[in-house]
Regions:
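ATP-dependent carboxylate-amine ligase
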Residues: 56-64, 70-80, 84-222
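Acidic, Mg2+-coordinating active-site environments of NTP-dependent enzymes
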Residues: 1-93, 217
Length: 222
């Protein structure tokens, strides 16, 4: 058991995930495998790292790369985690309702390259949004649709600290998710994506993040 634990630590420390041009490759212990990003449902650099770890463990268990890749291509990730919901009227919709902190929203926007509108906001727990605001001020996403209590606070902080950003008309302040979806549907161009990644808790508005994601899915696909 100790030897296995030590090997797992080594895998974690030495795993590399390299993105070059249109390829993503996991490398460990002199071996490598190309991750077929376009053929899998797991999105994001953090998931690609986890895929690399799983692949290295499979090598330890003498599972062939072809078998690993076959399983990877059919793996269905858990819902509400940067989940592709489908396409309607040419707009692709992604549900990242599990996002309750700044970092996850930043990861989502770094992963999806064609987002026209991102929906942010929820219950206000008093967390610091300065990192997310700095990121958004330099990110090319055309429309940032803010909702609920944290959306209002983010809007006010941007207005005070980034007045030029606020004047760019990229910010849309709404009350609730339903209003935010209506704005997103008007603003998102066909062929582009609409992402809900709230960076906030759902409590007091929804039962949990799962319900928030389910409501979002119903609103965008109805």
């Amino acid at each position: 058991q100790g030897a296995v634990s030590e090997e797992m630590v080594n895998i974690w420390k030495k795993m590399e995930v390299i993105q070059e041009n249109d390829t993503t490759e996991a490398r460990y212990d002199g071996h490598s495998i190309e991750i077929p990003v376009s053929q899998i449902r797991l999105l994001g650099q953090h998931n690609y790292f986890d895929i690399g770890i799983a692949w290295a463990v499979c090598r330890l268990l003498n599972i062939r790369d072809e078998v690993f890749l076959e399983g990877l291509k059919t793996y269905e990730p858990l819902p509400h985690r940067l989940q592709f919901l489908g396409e309607k009227n040419g707009i692709k919709y992604y549900d990242d309702s599990i996002s309750t902190i700044c970092e996850t929203t930043i990861q989502a926007l770094n992963t999806l390259k064609d987002v026209d509108a991102v929906l942010i906001g929820g219950m206000d727990r008093g967390i610091d949004y300065s990192e997310l605001i700095r990121f958004l001020s330099g990110h090319p996403v055309p429309y940032i649709i803010l909702m609920e209590a944290t959306g209002k606070r983010i809007f006010e902080e941007i207005r005070q600290d980034y007045p030029d950003f606020q004047k760019m008309e990229r910010l849309i302040l709404t009350d609730h998710l339903e209003d935010a979806v209506k704005e997103a549907q008007k603003l998102t161009r066909p062929g582009h994506s609409c992402l809900m990644s709230p960076a906030a808790a759902s409590y007091g508005i929804f039962k949990n993040f799962e319900e928030r994601g389910e409501v979002f899915a119903r609103l965008v696909l109805k």
